[in-house]
Amino acid sequence: MPDRSPEYITGWLEKNLHRMDNPSQFLGTEPGAARKPWDQVSVRWLVAASWPYYHSTGNQSIPAVCATINNGRDDFYADRFYLPETPRDLRSLERAGIPVFGIESRHQARDFDALGTSISYAVLWMNFTKMIKLSGIPLRWRDRESDPGTYPMLVAGGQAYCAPGFMEPVADCIFLGEVEDEPGNGGLSQVNARIAQFKAEGSWCADRIGCYERLAREFNYLFFPRFVQTFYRYEDRGLPEPSKQVAGYAALLDGMRMPFRSRTVKNLDNIAPLTQAPLLYADPRMGAGDLEVGRGCDAWCSFCRLGWVTNPPRERSVAKSVEHAKAWQRNMGSTELSPFSPDFPMHRQKKRLLAALLENVNSSLDVTAMRIDDFNADDQYVLIQAHAGADGVTFGVEGTSARMRDLVGKGTTDDDVVEAVTRGIRAGFRKFKLFMICDLPGEETGDVMKIVDLGRRLAAVRAELGQPNVVFQMSFTPLLIEAATPFQWFRPTPLDYTLIKVAEEFRDLGIQFKIGTKAEPNKIALFQLCQRASRDVGEAITDVFEELGTACWGGVPKDARERLEAALVRHGFRNGLADCFDERYRGDLFGWEYISTGVSQDQLWEVYRQMVEFLEGTDPDTYEQQFSGPSGGAEWLPRCDQQCRGNACGVCDGEDLKLRAARIRSSDADIDLARVKVIDQDSVALKVRARIEVPERNRYVTREHWKYAIRRAAYLAQDGLEWKTGIAKKTVQLASEVCRHRDWACGTDYAEFGLTWHPPGGELPMFIDNMCAELAPWLLLTAWDVFPPGASMRQDAGLALWDLEVAASPDEVAARLRDFAASDYVKLVIRSDSAYFGAGNEEVNARDWVSDLWLTRRGHTYTLRMLISAKAGPYAMYAAVMGKPSWIEAAARPAIRRGLFTGSPAGGSGQPDLLRPECEGCGETVPAGLLNEMYAAPGGGDFCPRCADEAAGSVVAALTPSSLV
């Protein structure tokens, strides 16, 4: 991969962004983006988010936290890069030789001091390795040993740190635990300070390995794989060949402490929460945030690593949480917050916290993932949840039968589930998702079929309460045996296809059935192998990722399992996956035991031993008769509701909380957006008016919300327009005036504002030329941002982007509108009774995420309107504004060739006769089978593809406004 300068990368983006599926992902000009002089910072990080979903995921979680920590100091800088959202965008970068780069600084990855990512599960590592290759950086740290100072330090962190074996061949450093700075407890900034010191000494480039040695000795939560060696031995495990097992570990660096220990923030009130992030243009949530109120879990479920390695549970105080929510609203202009699901049920004052957020911040809270024991414990808490804005709730039932739930320590009976659903329906919830873990060790067909009996009881409750529209969904996912849990000694259970029978039963009961994507055999095999990976297993996984040479957007290649088998054999695992998936014994060493998670192996083994005894002494057919009570036979594992947490209800005095009526339901919002009218050839009146009407009027919306939303919309417009064009000065000024103006009104269900602007006479042509490409997206952003929390559009709904009324000559109107309509990102539907634009409807170049763009005529006034589907969000908007003169020429030629316009400016021949098989250019008769290849050229008449292409080339200049050339 050749070196690419920031100027080269910027130039390529300007020429090619309009061809990307998600161009806004690479802009880096959003409000909240970090921009610092490159030469004035001492440590530069590139934080790469490898999520295979919308890049908003990486904007609000650990990558955003890391960026915030670095950018909080003047001498540190963190840029960002996101995995392209589609394979086509990734291929575009790869074919053009564009490396991974900071989207704000436009510097390539190799220019940074550190390249970091957060890994929560295995597939994300596959994506990160692809980004490393795209950056032109050798994949394995051994291949970087000859000249490590020329490459950034590759750092991995996240939840996968407990079993980092699959990352060891690649990562220079693995950050164990939590990164936030805490007084007296170090953090990421302390590591950065050391890197700055090394750079000042000149050793960061000249003696990079020496710098790594100094970091490894000082910070016990930084694990450098090059300084630890893993030993293996072969044992007879009853497999066809001797099994390769871990025999021990050795430190290769004097003064380095082993085992390594994960870092934990002791008091969440001591660290600053995430209160601001870049406002992503392409994020449909537009500023919605995540609210962290706690960390850790006191449930101690035997399958879940979260409950074992993140303890003790810690929580943020009510006052700090409310302060966090207010800061997010102030900075981001959105009151939509989603508390992290595992955190809220654990909070000792969850009822008071929820009430405080609703009362003081008026947030639209999605507190949908709940524990059944908490849900059943307090009717008032259930009602407060219903006020929070969601119409559905998710229950973690976990096991398919009471026996399986007792095995994992959940202790939930079918009666508990039915009671929770009954309470929820009476409180107003209408959607219930029950999350199940299947394929647990010891699970039998009888356990699986027990869930059908539960489904029948739920259907009966729905009928008894007279709520036929209540939706139930049973969601199943196979067990992933995680490291550092009591389950780590079990052999992974093969997928049990008994669930197919369950699906048929649920269909008859009117209950939705869903199996998670991890159930795909190749994917679960990869996930499970990464959880059990030692150093050499990681080498095999890296080989496979390198062979595949691609990223993962949800699925895993079909031949991944076969490739893993072959790679394991090459690295000495003669039985392939069987060596890794075999049952473990007490004396076995796991591939991660050089890391201390705070939970001893003796404690985990004792729980495992009791689980084995429990399975041997029970069976699904007689279990409910053998044991009574909610805890069943799981006496060996303390249950959450049996542990005193001070006051389980969360409210010290149990006072009756009074809330405003704030019940939110999904509804459609009608938007009447804007109108632009050219009065004459010297002036234009622009009336920008956004009005949102929510049919359900019992939603209380504060005046402050509308003010934040409108101000943010105008800020977005100003920032975006200023970056994109240097000639639309007055349009930028317009956005600035909206930031300052006071001509707006609001109510509980609407907000509107208006502004009239009269440009000087000489600027009218320029204004018309740029109105389509610049003003339209600003108006859409305005409408998108003032959407009230809780209001939503149907998937097939659209919103009117803008109307343009021009009292001018038809030739001038046609020239202006054709320029905009020549985009490959829209479809044009010409609807008019005028022969000038053709009769009837003609759809050309449809995109499934764009609705309609149509033109109507009354006398000499033409109205152009675009409808953009809710599915698209601001995607299509940015596709329309990325235009430069070179883009207009490139887009106009194929658009004309396909017959985007019919007729001619002078009147022409009107709608072409598609049944005539002769080309008017060359006179050649076109075979009947190719009639659909006939085209209408701008001069009128029908042409074959070759002649139409030549005709298109002759009119490109006419379609390009002179002010843009």
What are these regions (language model features)?
Residues 1-168, 203, 731-740, 805-807:
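Acidic, glycine-rich segments characteristic of secretory precursors and extracytoplasmic regions
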